[in-house]
Amino acid sequence: MENSKISSKRVIGILVAIVVLLAVGYQAVKAGEKPPAVGGVAPDFTLTSQDGNAINLHDYRGKWVVLYFYPKDFTSGCTTEAHNFQRDLAQYQQKNAVILGVSVDTADSHQKFCTKEGLNFKLLADTEHKVSDEYGSVMNLGVKKLSARHTFIINPDGVVVKEYLDVDPGKHSGEVLAALGELQPGAGSK
């Protein structure tokens, strides 16, 4: 009887600790900088891709950019989201859109992730979380910072035209494609 009371108290304590940690993590996302305003120019940046090349957002002027931030390579939600972007890659290309993924992982981690998962779009290493900060996409977990799961659609003039701050990895690529269809009248018929 005494052991079951201790076990119950221990389980309740663990559950309370988990809820507190989740709440702190959620609030930490809100504690960073604000995302760029829809209608404003997307902050420019240069980051290293999985192949070691410097990628500058400005180099994509003239194209639509799907800039998506995600927490971590090789995790279930991030892998699902990346697989769906890869599955739909040809449709993005038909819409004159490129996909750029950003996380705080290293370029080497991105290379391994792309190789293992068959990803053929750029993943950018924001190891010092400066770009994630600038886009209001940081989860500060105290001892570690991760990119938050946010996405920005940037038009060919470099203007943020849509943002997603609450992303379901399983549905997100379809939502972004639909938004591009609305933002680009006739894009599907090109």
Write out the residue ranges for each language-model feature:
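N-terminal targeting signals for export/organelle localization
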Residues: 1-48, 186, 190
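Structural microenvironment flanking redox-active thiols in thiol-disulfide oxidoreductases
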Residues: 79-119, 127-134
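Thiol-/selenol-based redox modules, centered on thioredoxin-like
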Residues: 146-190
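Structural micro-motif
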Residues: 119-121, 138-141, 145-152
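A short beta-strand-turn-helix
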Residues: 36, 45-65
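Short loop/turn microsegments at loop-to-beta-strand junctions
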Residues: 42-43, 64, 148-150
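Short active-site neighborhood of thiol/selenol oxidoreductases, capturing the structured segment around
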Residues: 58-80, 85
